Regions:
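Conserved phosphate-binding/catalytic region of the ribokinase-like
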Residues: 1-5, 173-177, 205-314
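Glycine-rich phosphate/adenosyl-contacting loop at the front of the ribokinase-like
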Residues: 1-64, 69-80, 249-251
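Short beta-strand scaffold segments in enzyme catalytic cores
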Residues: 47, 98-102, 110-111, 231-235
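A glycine-rich helix N-cap at a beta->alpha junction
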Residues: 77-93
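Conserved phosphate-binding/catalytic loop of the ribokinase/pfkB sugar-kinase fold
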Residues: 86-91, 101-138, 143
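Conserved beta-alpha-beta core of the PfkB/ribokinase-like small-molecule kinase fold
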Residues: 125-129, 136-210, 230-232
């Protein structure tokens, strides 16, 4: 049986240091704690989709790792969450990817990624993914693997009848031909600015509709502009609306975007209406920022449903 959701993307081991404030260039600061946590945008989203979705095997991840202990740990973590890891293969060309993450007391972070084996997921590998895409409802992508591979895989997923979701992170300009193969594009503010060739800046919610309109003109069917604590703005043929976020006490924002993307994809794969899917995604992301870490911060489905019920009653 083919999975309902396929995630094509990165796997990294995250080295997380908590600090009082993020270091300035040339500055040394003392950390308050250290953790080694499974991560990578692709792996985070696959883990989140499995925890938020249906039965084991309904989510499969495709990616590359090295021949090392980090690879074993990452695959075991995904398997424990219910992700099918049979399309994650090892390469001797590079070690498993790693990310160095600093998190301050406000929950804000800075991240440096050494991609390693993630760069070995090549366009030639996409042919082997076609049978996995066939029958899947959605294929979810990010940009921590080679751009040529993402472009080829987007095309293949569409040709095999799946709908596509692209989280355009890390932020970078993208060719219009690639964006035309995206059904749902989910940038945050800085990623939206980079896609449009603008200086990266903090945007007011009032600017979201115009920005989303410009992004939709690039080709994607649906734009979901993530606005942090403000929630998100959606522009599609069926919906033009702000969907507000949920105020919570923020501890760590590391995997908020990954949780949002996974939750949105799960809800859409289940056939939920777009506005309901966005509310589900906002709730899942809100819970995740109250916890430290990437995959460890992702809530289960029952937690999100209970969170939504409690907010409707309050």
């Amino acid at each position: 049986m083919n999975p309902a959701i396929v995630v094509v993307g990165s796997l990294n081991m995250d080295f997380v240091v908590t600090v009082d404030c993020l270091p300035a260039p040339g500055e040394t600061v003392l950390g308050r704690g250290f953790q080694m946590i499974p991560g990578g945008k692709g792996a985070n989203q696959a883990c989140a989709a499995a925890k938020l979705g249906g039965p084991a095997g309904s989510v499969r991840m495709a990616g590359r790792v090295g021949y090392d202990l980090f690879a074993d740990h990452l695959k075991a973590s995904l398997s424990a969450a219910g992700v099918d890891v049979t399309a994650i293969h090892a390469t001797r060309a590079q070690p498993t990817g790693v990310a160095l993450i600093w998190v301050d007391r406000r929950g804000q972070n800075s991240i440096v990624v050494a991609s390693g084996a993630n760069h070995e997921l090549l366009p030639v590998d996409v042919a082997a993914l076609r049978p996995i895409f066939r029958g899947a409802r959605f294929v979810l992508f990010q940009l921590e693997t080679p751009l040529d591979t993402v472009a080829r895989a987007l095309e293949a997923a569409r040709e095999e009848g799946a709908r596509t979701v692209l989280d355009p992170a890390p932020a970078q300009p993208l060719p219009k031909e690639l964006l035309a193969r995206v059904d749902v594009l989910t940038p945050n503010e800085s990623e939206a600015c980079r896609l449009l060739g603008r200086p990266v800046e903090r945007l007011s919610p009032e600017e979201a509709p115009a920005l989303a309109g410009e992004l939709r003109n690039l080709g994607p069917e649906t734009i979901v502009l993530k606005l942090g604590e403000h929630g998100c703005y959606c522009l599609s043929a069926a919906l033009e609306k702000f969907v507000p976020g949920f105020p919570v006490e923020v501890r760590d924002t590391t995997a908020a975007g990954d949780t949002f993307n996974a939750a949105l994809t799960v809800a859409l794969a289940e056939g939920r209406l777009l506005e309901d899917a966005l509310r589900f995604a906002n709730a899942a992301a809100a819970i995740s920022v109250t916890r430290l870490g990437a995959q460890a911060s992702v809530p289960g489905r029952s937690e999100v449903e209970e969170f939504l019920r409690s907010r409707m009653l309050s």
